[in-house]
Amino acid sequence: MEEFKRYLELDRSQQHDFIYPLIFQEYIYALAHDRGLNRSIVFENRDYDNKSSLLIRKRLITXXXXXXXXXXXXXXXXKNKFLGYNTNFDSQMIFEGFAVVVEIPFYLQLLSSLEGKEIVKSHNLRSLHSIFPXXXXXXXXXXXXXXXXXXXXXXMEILVRTLRYWVKDPSSLHLLRFFLHEYPNRNSLITPKKYSFSFSKRNQKFFLFLYNFHVCEYESIFVFLRNQSSHLCSISFETFLERILFYKKIELEVFVKDFKGILWVFKDPFLHYVRYRGKSILASNGSSLLMNKWKYYLVNFWECYFSIWAQPRRIHINQLSNNSFDFLGYLSSVRLKPSMVRTQMIENSFLIENASKKFDTLVPITPMIASLSKAKFCNVLGHPMNKXVWDGLSDSDIIERIGRLYXNLSHYYSGSLKKMNLXRIKFILRILLCGTLASKHKGTLRSVLNRLGVGLLVEFITEEEQVFYLTFQKASSTSRKLYQRRIWYLDIFCVNDTANHE
C-alpha cells in the first residue's frame, strides 16, 4: 500500500514555473539555476551539452530577441505584396519560445533518470529500427496480439490539461490556452489519419511535445497497472482512485463498476507492449478471452482517465499462429517450425516430432501497391501508369529516381525470408520506367530500348539485391564455431511512404 502511495503521489518538487522565463526572454537562462525544478538534478554536470551552457544560451536568446523584434516590426508594417498578411507570425514565435522553455527541465529530468543506468548495447543489430530483435525474442513465445491505434485527443485542451499536473503556476497554462484558442488554424493542428496523426508543419516541435507528453503520461500509468496486475486480487481498489482524481472526478461506485470485473483476471506476466508511429501492439501468451479483457480495459482506461473515446473496433485481436499483424511495414507472425529428432535407447530407436515457434516476416504486397497507387505509379489494381509530370526530367534522372525507389524497398525488406512479392513491385517499376521514357520521347517501347540499350535497363532495374549477412562468434559455444544470423540493411536514412503503411 505504501509503495502505491509513493508512486501515485505527484511529486511537487518536479513542478515548474514557466511564465516568468517566457515573458522575460533575456533571463531564460535563469531557468537552469532554478533549484526548485528538481533538487536531485545537478545542473552543472560536466556531461551536459556544452552548446546549452548558460552564457551561450543567454547570448543566443538576446540575439534572437533583437532579430525577432525587427522581424515583428516588419511584419506589422504594410501588407507584403508577395506573402500578404502573416496572421500567425506572433503565435508561431510564442509556440517556439514555449517549446524551448518546457523542454529544458524535462531534458534535465531525463539526464537525471539515466544516471547510474547502463545502456545495453546490442552487438547483433538485425533491423533498420532495432526493434526486430526484441520482437523476435519476446513475440515468439506469445500466442495472441492486439493491434491498437493510439488514441488521440479530440481537442487541444486535453493535451494542455495533462501539463497542469507538472506546471504549478496557472498563468502559464492560461497563456498557453489563450494562444491555442487564438491560433488561426487551431482546428487543423492535429489531423487524424488512418493510423497516425499529422501535425501542422508550423509549430510542429511544440505540438509534438504536447502529444508525446500526453502519450507518455498515460503509458506510464498503464505500465504501472500492468506490472501490478498479478497482485490485483489482494489489493484494495481504492488505491487506484487516488491517481484518477488527478485527472477527473470519478465516484468510487463508477470506478468499481467499470474496472473491478476486468482487473482481477489480469494475471498474465508475459504481456509485451510496444508503440511505433501511433500504433500499439500488445502481445501475450494468454487466451483470446484475456486479450478481449485487456481490449475493453484499454477503452475504459482512455475514456475515464483522459476523456478520450477509443473505438473498440479499432483494436484488432489476432492469433499469431494463424494471422499476421502489420508493424514497421512488415506483416509479422509466429509460425510453427516442425522438426524431427531420432533418439536411440539401447536396442530401440524413436522418432520424436517437435514444433518450435519462429518469428516470421512477410512483404505486404497490398499496402505497397496502395502506396504506389497513391503516388500515381500505378492504379489500385497494380497496373503501371506513366509519370507524365517527369517529362521535364532527363532520362538519367528518371532512371535514377525509379531505381532508388526500388533499391530502398529491396533493402528495407531484405530481412524477410519470403521476398516473392518484390518481383511484382519490380515488374511495376520496370514497366513504369519504360512507359515514362516512351511517353516523354513520343515513341514506342522498342525505340526507347534500342536508343538506351536493353542491357542498361536490364542490369539497372533487374539486378537482384543480395541478402546481407554478418558472421558472429558465439561465446557460449564450447567448440568456438561460427554461426550466421540474418540482419536487415542498415544504410538507409529515409524510407518513403511505400515502406510506412501506418
Swiss-Prot record:
BP GO annotations: mRNA processing; RNA splicing; tRNA processing
Keywords noted in UniProt: Chloroplast, mRNA processing, Plastid, RNA-binding, tRNA processing
UniProt xrefs under InterPro entries: Domain_X, Maturase_MatK, Maturase_MatK_N
Highest taxon above the source species: Eukaryota
KW tRNA processing (keyword) present: yes
CC annotations in GO: chloroplast
Coiled-coil residue windows: none
The keyword Nucleus appears for this protein: no
A Pfam match: Intron_maturas2
Example of a GO MF term: RNA binding
Compartments in which it is found: Plastid, Chloroplast
Protein family (similarity comment): Belongs to the intron maturase 2 family. MatK subfamily.
Function text: Usually encoded in the trnK tRNA gene intron. Probably assists in splicing its own and other chloroplast group II introns.
Protein name: Maturase K
Organism ancestry: Eukaryota, Viridiplantae, Streptophyta, Embryophyta, Tracheophyta
Gene behind the chain: matK
